[in-house]
């Protein structure tokens, strides 16, 4: 006896593709049933596959310029990108995470990506799609945390 796939001359669906198809079907059903859409069924992992966009030009321009103090110079602090020691009185850029960099080192970096090269602290971008993705990701993490807390509270 021939299998279902042999009889219908087709191939079984890959699990990742099946998930996408189910999400699209759920979206279509929601649209047809009065726009009652549950965004939990929509997969927002598209940005996980791509590089993040550059940091916002406005944010980069507003990064504070800090003068290296004698204490910092004596501590032999180095720029994490070029590994040259900061000199006393030198003007460097400070990211919101408080890491210091030479302007010539950090500005090209932030022109390509939106995060600190050391700790990956993310700066805002000019991409509305990416900002929406970050908000949705934060909402999902918050929801998962609340569910874990609820689950933990049920069994303590």
Swiss-Prot record:
<dbReference type="InterPro" id="IPR001841">
    <property type="entry name" value="Znf_RING"/>
</dbReference>
<dbReference type="GO" id="GO:0005737">
    <property type="term" value="C:cytoplasm"/>
</dbReference>
<keyword id="KW-0863">Zinc-finger</keyword>
<comment type="function">
    <text>E3 ubiquitin-protein ligase which accepts ubiquitin from an E2 ubiquitin-conjugating enzyme in the form of a thioester and then directly transfers the ubiquitin to targeted substrates. Catalyzes monoubiquitination of 26S proteasome subunit PSMC2/RPT1.</text>
</comment>
<dbReference type="GO" id="GO:0008270">
    <property type="term" value="F:zinc ion binding"/>
</dbReference>
<comment type="similarity">
    <text>Belongs to the RNF181 family.</text>
</comment>
<keyword id="KW-0808">Transferase</keyword>
<dbReference type="Pfam" id="PF13639">
    <property type="entry name" value="zf-RING_2"/>
</dbReference>
<keyword id="KW-0862">Zinc</keyword>
<keyword id="KW-0479">Metal-binding</keyword>
<comment type="pathway">
    <text>Protein modification; protein ubiquitination.</text>
</comment>
<dbReference type="GO" id="GO:0061630">
    <property type="term" value="F:ubiquitin protein ligase activity"/>
</dbReference>
<keyword id="KW-0833">Ubl conjugation pathway</keyword>
<dbReference type="InterPro" id="IPR013083">
    <property type="entry name" value="Znf_RING/FYVE/PHD"/>
</dbReference>
<protein>
    <recommendedName>
        <fullName>E3 ubiquitin-protein ligase RNF181</fullName>
        <ecNumber>2.3.2.27</ecNumber>
    </recommendedName>
</protein>
<feature type="zinc finger region" description="RING-type; atypical">
    <location>
        <begin position="79"/>
        <end position="120"/>
    </location>
</feature>
<dbReference type="GO" id="GO:0016567">
    <property type="term" value="P:protein ubiquitination"/>
</dbReference>
């Amino acid at each position: 006896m021939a299998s279902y796939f042999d009889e219908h001359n087709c191939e079984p669906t890959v699990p990742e593709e099946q998930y996408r198809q189910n999400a699209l079907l759920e979206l279509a059903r929601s649209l047809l049933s009065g726009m009652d859409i549950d965004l939990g069924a929509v997969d927002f992992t598209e940005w996980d596959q791509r590089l993040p966009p550059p940091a916002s030009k406005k944010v980069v321009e507003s990064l504070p310029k800090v003068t290296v103090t004698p204490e910092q110079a004596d501590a032999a602090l180095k720029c994490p990108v070029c590994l040259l020691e900061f000199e006393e009185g030198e003007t460097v850029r400070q990211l919101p995470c408080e890491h210091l960099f030479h302007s010539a080192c950090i500005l090209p970096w932030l022109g390509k990506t939106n995060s600190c090269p050391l700790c990956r602290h993310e700066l805002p971008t000019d991409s509305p799609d990416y900002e929406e993705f970050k908000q949705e990701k934060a909402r999902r993490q918050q929801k998962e945390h609340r569910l874990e807390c609820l689950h933990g509270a049920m069994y303590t």
